[in-house]
């Protein structure tokens, strides 16, 4: 079972998702990989996505209104208000202009797009070029995040970027659920008295943050052993891309390309007790 409160059913569902995203019920067009949108229920969250190495990665959590990487902008991702880009390889970021343009055409609110801070200027230039070609606003809010930097998404949700290890600048994201909990010394007081304390400037609650979702994007397994990434392993759901799953490619082959081999995940998990 996965560490951090994840159930055996959740682990089984993860295996199902990994298998499902590599198959399709229909015959693909010549020269294109087979892919269908997959839906699962894990730890109380509905998860939808497409992931084919080198072609497209996009994973959404509809109840949280967020999408990790945008792939080729599959239609199911357009409705999500928050987009988190892990790195700039085309199979992860290629659909970004279309995502923003489609939301604008549908008169949806401008999305908030999070990118590694080192990519922010390049992304701005990308949109400048597309605005010139498309003659449209392509309105969105771009938020550059450094590793370890945090951002409050909503009253109840917060994101933190964490370090990953790919062949280009990259990072993952942890989504935290934020709750206000009444301090023990004020428990049992009448509501009116609590209200008066608030009005007088007294802080009567503590903020509690729980890691709910973590997404790695493309990376080597080193991120699992990074001591700064402890919350990543505590998340209820950790989405990890394992590009190589059999002996047709070695662990060394995977590392050379900045990816994870499934065998390495298993070995690392045994060392860290990520799964037990």
Where are these regions (language model features)?
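Active-site-proximal loop/helix segment associated with metal-binding centers of metalloenzymes
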Residues: 52, 152-242, 246-247
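Active-site neighborhood of divalent metal-dependent phosphoester bond hydrolases
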Residues: 107-111, 119-144
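Binuclear metal-ion centers of metallo-dependent hydrolases, dominated by the metallo-beta-lactamase
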Residues: 1, 8-14, 135-137, 141-148, ...
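Active-site metal-binding motif and surrounding structural segment of the metallo-beta-lactamase
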Residues: 71-115
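Divalent metal-dependent hydrolysis catalytic cores, especially in the metallo-beta-lactamase
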Residues: 111-117, 272-276
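Conserved beta-strand hairpin/beta-sheet module of binuclear metal-dependent hydrolase folds
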Residues: 2-81, 171-175, 181, 205-216
């Amino acid at each position: 079972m996965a560490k951090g409160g994840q159930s055996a059913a959740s682990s089984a569902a993860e295996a199902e998702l990994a298998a499902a995203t590599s198959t399709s019920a229909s015959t693909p067009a010549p020269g294109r990989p087979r892919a269908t949108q997959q839906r699962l229920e894990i730890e109380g969250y509905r998860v939808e996505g497409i992931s084919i190495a080198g072609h497209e990665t996009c994973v959404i959590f509809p109840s949280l209104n967020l999408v990790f990487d945008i792939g080729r902008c599959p239609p199911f991702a357009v409705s999500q208000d928050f987009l988190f880009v892990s790195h700039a390889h085309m199979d992860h970021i290629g659909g970004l202009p279309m995502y923003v343009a489609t939301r604008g055409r549908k008169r949806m609110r401008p999305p908030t797009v999070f990118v590694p801070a080192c990519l922010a200027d390049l992304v701005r230039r990308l949109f400048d070029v597309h605005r010139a070609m498309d003659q449209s606003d392509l309105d969105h809010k771009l938020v550059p995040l450094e590793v370890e930097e945090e951002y409050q998404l909503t009253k109840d949700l917060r994101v933190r970027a964490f370090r990953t290890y790919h062949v280009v600048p990259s990072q993952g994201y942890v989504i935290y659920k934020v709750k206000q909990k009444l301090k023990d010394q004020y428990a049992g007081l009448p509501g009116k008295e609590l209200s008066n304390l608030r009005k007088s400037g007294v802080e009567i609650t503590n903020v509690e943050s729980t890691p709910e979702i973590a997404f790695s994007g493309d990376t080597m397994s080193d991120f699992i052993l990074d001591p700064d990434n402890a919350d990543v392993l505590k998340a209820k759901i950790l989405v990890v891309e394992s590009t190589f799953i059999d002996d047709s490619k070695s662990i060394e082959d995977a590392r050379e390309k900045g990816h994870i081999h499934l065998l390495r995940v298993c070995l690392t998990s045994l060392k860290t007790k990520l799964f037990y």
